[in-house]
Amino acid sequence: MTAPPGARPRAASPPPNMRSRDFWGSAARLVKRLAPQRRLSIAVITLGIAGTTIGVIVPRILGHATDLLFNGVIGRGLPGGITKAQAVASARARGDNTFADLLSGMNVVPGQGVDFAAVERTLALALALYLAAALMIWAQARLLNLTVQKTMVRLRTDVEDKVHRLPLSYFDGQQRGELLSRVTNDIDNLQSSLSMTISQLVTSILTMVAVLAMMVSISGLLALITLLTVPLSLLVTRAITRRSQPLFVAHWTSTGRLNAHLEETYSGFTVVKTFGHQAAARERFHELNDDVYQAGFGAQFLSGLVQPATAFIGNLGYVAVAVAGGLQVATGQITLGSIQAFIQYIRQFNMPLSQLAGMYNALQSGVASAERVFDVLDEPEESPEPEPELPNLTGRVEFEHVNFAYLPGTPVIRDLSLVAEPGSTVAIVGPTGAGKTTLVNLLMRFYEIGSGRILIDGVDIASVSRQSLRSRIGMVLQDTWLYDGTIAENIAYGRPEATTDEIVEAARAAHVDRFVNTLPAGYQTRVSGDGGSISVGEKQLITIARAFLARPQLLILDEATSSVDTRTELLIQRAMRELRRDRTSFIIAHRLSTIRDADHILVVQTGQIVERGNHAELLARRGVYYQMTRA
């Protein structure tokens, strides 16, 4: 995104923001972004519930298979023809109370061995349920990926639309690389974080609830022992994440600053090499790269402690349950298969708890990126567009007591008034920072004036839409801009519906045809953003041809010939005289030779017109303009 010429310089970039302003608020706002995908989200949750429920039931089924095997082994060792009660009484009579307690809690038939058919049916059912759960989890993952992709496409679109609604004053205070990092890196990181966390979050919470219900159904005491570890895990997680979250914010902020430095260095690499600043650029790169490393390492190191810490706490609960459960089996309070199922449930319970702690790492990084993206979406936009369109113009432009300041208290334009009659050429000259370019930026409504009015044919430009206004004005900037495409496509950027003949006509008027005809591919020669193999002057000619093709009713030339050689400049001046006919034109240039034929010349200093007249009149006054011609 290229700011208009004369935009106020940016301040030095601040150090990385080390605090997340509202983690849970940003996370909630992120969840709301999923609302348009309600059907997909409901399908994801439904599949998650079904898959989790099946996965939780299977350990209980496997516990039943264990009971079948154990009952058969014990039953085979007992004499046949007696009941279980008689076998228990016989064991107590022998003084073997431990075996009697164990036997009383079992569903055993004395003299009967293992029912392998029942075991096979039970295991087959468990296998079928495992396969069904796996398919549901797979389908859930695919639908979740689709949900996240659609949400991110919408978010990227919203950010892109927002950028086009932002005033240019926003870009004055932003490095392009930093903004690009928000639109690309941060959204990519957000997408990755959502894909990693949402599925696990839904599945983990459902698993914990379902597993807890199954554990309570087996043994309330063992379930209580397991739950005692949860508050401790949450306290440890909170203590760690409170220290790691600011580092995630700093990491992505530092990444944006690094991208901004690279964008500035690479786009101006010729200047960097010309003035021998490679060492300084490398040193600055290493400083910013080290900032990214330090913040990233600290964030990952701290957040990486969460999972092992919660796993350790979970293992403490596992040991306690193993001891208490063994005692309950020995006393016949629960069966061996039940304690086996309970131990599996502990693993299932601790795993999502550990995953929740671990995914908080990715969630912190994602929310840090989300805050940076939401910052762009929350920026104040340009003032609302009025509906009326600008009528056909004769071209009278009037500034009435216009005042403007980029920053409050620092006026750039002071009580400026001027009139440009239809078809006239108005040249604006003055030292750097005098406010020349600011005048045309105000005419284009790139910025809103502080007070006063700007009228075109008596219509206040603030009362018509910006698009209607800008479609009537052709503007050639000092900094040329080409996009990756052919020369013909770059010229047609001024009016995409133009025919080939119209493109060639505009190119001929700007003398682009003189060098295009020497190229093997002619108008189909591809050029890149930096111009590729064509010269700076040739780039300037292409942008001028683009403006001519747009058929503007007003023309603004900002340093339009300052980057071309003398011969090309003479050709352009000759073409300009013809193209300016019947168009009100504003020319800004430091080369006074380009404005000798202007109808009116305005000499601007510190935002005020200090002299006005044509070339001969101003020379005769021997004032500021005269001194400029002598310099």
Curated annotation (Swiss-Prot):
The chain crosses the membrane at residues 42-62, 123-143, 205-225. It is found in: Cell inner membrane. Its EC number is 7.6.2.-. It is a multi-pass membrane protein. Keywords: ATP-binding, Cell inner membrane, Cell membrane, Membrane, Nucleotide-binding, Translocase, Transmembrane, Transmembrane helix, Transport. Residues 42-365 form the ABC transmembrane type-1 domain. PROSITE patterns: ABC_TM1F, ABC_TRANSPORTER_1, ABC_TRANSPORTER_2. It comes from the Bacteria. SMART domains: AAA. It holds the Pfam family ABC_membrane. ABC transporter involved in fatty acid import. Transmembrane domains (TMD) form a pore in the membrane and the ATP-binding domain (NBD) is responsible for energy generation. This is Fatty acid ABC transporter ATP-binding/permease protein. The lineage of its organism: Bacteria, Bacillati, Actinomycetota, Actinomycetes, Mycobacteriales.
